[in-house]
């Protein structure tokens, strides 16, 4: 499904979507907050939108009011980070998203009701880009921007565990990248670049040349998207029903949020998303960024299947290794059983004891099974293989973040 985000686009797009069978989530051109004087104008906008594109069979859902209370998180401000004024600003933004107000409580109810009357054949999402209602039944595609405007991509599972309804259908997933080139130290400077986010997560000054920085922005985009998608897939139907990536194509040659650049060439993130969205994936909890010798990790292993038939006699293998590990240190674990269709299944837990070595540590997962005709194609039996790899780095215990933090605190007290 492709979402036409906050606007109505050219007729050729809808004609091509009809021809190819592409499904569309069509937003109304209603973005941001409005005063109480616009009720009649909003109804006119809805009526015209239905008249102009409502006859296209590719449109399967209407989106009503986009970000009625503004973005929950603005661009990071390193000069204000952690200050009481910045925390107060975040609290005020959250209050606008969850407490009753004109846009949320009245205008959006009108949009949902009237749009449903104008086009009763399609479902309507009255508002999007807001937090779920406190204690209410409404869900939303909350735009959290983890790993780009706040927090990190590793916060995704923790945030969803604390407020599960945020995982219902999250949006605001992604990061900007810079096109390959000899970028100066002042980059990024193109018109739509979110410079503050680059400075926080992938600063140009941290790289010796522009080409390395541009490649790092693409690697970071892959990491953020993969972390979100894998976490969401592990929560299938409990409560997640899907997700929406920020953009498919960059709006300008210099860069953007897209999985494709402005010339429609695939970025590395395009392949990352393709792999993360395959019909069957094998998943593990994220490894820490660094580990130390002797540390023990327990990681749950899940298999998420989009197939409509079960995978019988499935075998999941887990191998923990490093580039220079002797054979006796390589750790292996296996699981066997049936993987139900259209479900996420926890197959077991892998316990890793970090050996007394330093350097890369990798967890390789592989699932192998067969599915009868009807699952993937027209043959009688199909082999299903899913693989995944997670990486961390083993560092000496004295260099662990906890130890370094403790040293800094002790120096501060002395």
Question: Which residues are covered by each model-predicted region?
Answer:
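Extracellular Ig-like/FN3 beta-sandwich strand-entry sites
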Residues: 296, 313, 345, 358-362
């Amino acid at each position: 499904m492709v979402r036409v985000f906050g606007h109505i686009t050219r007729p050729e797009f809808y004609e091509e979507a009809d021809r190819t069978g592409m499904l569309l989530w069509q937003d109304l051109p209603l973005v941001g907050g409005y005063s109480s004087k616009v009720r009649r104008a909003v109804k006119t906008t809805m009526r015209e939108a239905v008249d102009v594109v409502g006859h296209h069979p590719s449109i399967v859902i209407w989106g009503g009011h986009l970000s009625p209370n503004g973005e929950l998180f603005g661009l990071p401000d390193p000069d204000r980070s952690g200050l009481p004024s910045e925390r107060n600003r975040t609290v005020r933004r959250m209050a606008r998203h969850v407490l009753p107000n004109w846009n949320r409580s009245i205008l959006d109810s009108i949009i949902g009701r009237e749009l449903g009357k104008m086009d009763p054949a399609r479902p309507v999402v009255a508002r999007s880009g807001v937090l779920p209602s406190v204690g209410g039944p409404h869900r939303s595609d909350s735009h959290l921007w983890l790993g780009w405007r706040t927090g990190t991509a590793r916060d995704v599972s923790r945030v969803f565990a604390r407020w599960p309804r945020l995982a219902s259908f999250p949006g605001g997933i992604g990061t900007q990248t810079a096109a390959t080139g000899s970028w100066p130290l002042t980059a990024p400077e193109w018109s739509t670049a979110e410079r503050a986010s680059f400075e926080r997560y992938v600063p140009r000054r941290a790289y010796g040349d522009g080409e390395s920085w541009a490649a790092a922005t693409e690697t970071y985009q892959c990491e953020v998207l993969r972390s979100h998608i894998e976490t969401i897939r592990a929560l299938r139907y409990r409560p997640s029903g899907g997700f929406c990536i920020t953009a498919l194509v960059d709006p300008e040659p210099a860069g953007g949020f897209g999985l494709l650049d402005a010339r429609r060439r695939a970025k590395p993130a395009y392949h990352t998303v393709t792999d993360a969205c395959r019909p069957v994936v094998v998943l593990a909890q994220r490894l820490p960024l660094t580990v130390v010798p002797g540390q023990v990790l327990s990681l749950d292993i899940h298999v998420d299947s989009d197939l409509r038939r079960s995978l019988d006699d499935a075998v999941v293998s887990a191998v923990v290794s490093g580039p220079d590990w002797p054979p006796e240190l390589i750790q292996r674990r296996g699981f066997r059983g049936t993987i139900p269709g259209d479900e996420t299944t926890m197959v077991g837990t892998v316990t890793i004891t970090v050996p007394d070595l330093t350097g890369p540590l990798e967890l390789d997962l592989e699932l192998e099974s067969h599915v009868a005709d009807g699952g993937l194609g027209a043959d009688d039996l199909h082999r299903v293989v899913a693989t995944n790899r997670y990486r961390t780095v083993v560092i000496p215990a004295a260099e662990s973040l906890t130890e370094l933090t403790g040293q800094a605190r002790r120096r501060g007290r002395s």
